[in-house]
């Protein structure tokens, strides 16, 4: 029988009574995830580097009646990650149901042009932060009796996408981390899954990708369009629900079919 963590059969499609930490929640996919979890009843804490943006989002969330708290944190910093988890532990009395490792960045260069500093920065922001925050969250997730970790990875961790080899390497490693933690922490009733978006319209993608890149992304996507942040967040929320209690160690793409698209003829012969 599936463990419900004391939530009861009638709460299979609710996050009421649960607590969550979402990194990078002030914009893009992170913002959409915060709202999705809060709409389902979770108490959510989120962090970002920009305090002004955080306060703007917080006012919006409070106006909607969401139970959200915020703090400033640069998750590429080990000391700040430790402080963040101390804050979360204090807020939620040493228990946490949901951890969404969402923060990510990239530097787009040919592989031969990357510096040691480039490598360290992308690795620390994407992979090291997800690994360390999962470590720090483990006792809180275990104490909750029903824990779920979701790593926001990328289609670039599943197939080649020319957005930087370091970025792709970090995302591939995150997918494997999800598999490892799923097996290692299953006995603690902690599930871990990886969500891999393709081209999603966010402030980050708008900053990095020009219209030509977007056209190419659309051309290679069977659904013929790019995605939106609120098309990723429902999957993240589902993986945290009691109804997903037997799903762990999975890598799931949200990509309009892009990662399964081989070579598609415009017209059949």
Curated annotation (Swiss-Prot):
Induction: No basal expression in untreated young leaves, but rapidly and strongly up-regulated upon abscisic acid treatment. Strongly up-regulated (10'000-fold higher expression at day 33) in the quinolinate synthase mutant old5.
Positions that bind substrate: 154
GO molecular function: alcohol dehydrogenase (NAD+) activity
Enzyme class, UniProt record, top EC level: oxidoreductase
Biological process (GO), any one: defense response to insect
Active site: 167
Keyword entries, A-Z: NADP, Oxidoreductase
Highest taxon in the source lineage: Eukaryota
Binding site for NADP(+): 21-45
Single GO cellular component term: peroxisome
Enzyme Commission number(s) of this protein: 1.1.1.-
Pfam (any one): adh_short_C2
Family named by the database record: Belongs to the short-chain dehydrogenases/reductases (SDR) family. SDR65C subfamily.
Function: Unspecific reductase providing both diastereomeric alcohols from the prochiral ketones. Active on cyclic monoterpenes and small flexible lipophilic carbonyls. No activity with tropinone, nitrogen-containing tropinone analogs, tropine or pseudotropine as substrate.
This protein's name: Senescence-associated protein 13
Species annotation: Arabidopsis thaliana
């Amino acid at each position: 029988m599936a463990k419900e963590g004391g939530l009861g059969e009638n709460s299979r499609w609710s996050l009421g009574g649960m607590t969550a930490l979402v990194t990078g929640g002030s914009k893009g996919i992170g913002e959409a995830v915060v709202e999705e979890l809060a709409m389902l009843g979770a108490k959510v804490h989120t962090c970002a580097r920009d305090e002004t943006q955080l306060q703007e989002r917080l006012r919006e969330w409070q106006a909607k009646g969401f139970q959200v708290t915020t703090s400033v944190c640069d998750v590429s910093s080990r000391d700040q990650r430790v402080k963040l988890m101390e804050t979360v532990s204090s807020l939620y009395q040493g228990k946490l149901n949901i951890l969404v490792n969402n923060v990510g960045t990239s530097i787009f260069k040919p592989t031969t042009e990357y510096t040691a500093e480039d490598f360290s920065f992308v690795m620390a922001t994407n992979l090291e932060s997800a690994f360390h925050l999962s470590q720090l969250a483990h006792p809180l997730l275990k104490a909750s009796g029903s824990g779920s970790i979701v790593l926001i990875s990328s289609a670039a961790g599943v197939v080649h996408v020319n957005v930087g080899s370091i970025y792709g390497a970090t995302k591939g490693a995150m997918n494997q981390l999800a598999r490892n933690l799923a097996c290692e922490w299953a006995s603690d009733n902690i599930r871990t899954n990886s969500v891999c978006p393709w081209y999603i319209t966010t402030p980050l993608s708008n900053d990095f990708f020009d219209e030509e890149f977007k056209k190419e992304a659309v051309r290679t996507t069977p659904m013929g369009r790019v995605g939106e942040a609120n098309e990723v967040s429902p999957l993240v929320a589902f993986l945290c629900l009691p109804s997903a209690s037997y799903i762990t160690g999975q890598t799931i793409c949200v990509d309009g079919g892009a990662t399964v698209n081989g070579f598609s003829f415009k017209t059949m012969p």
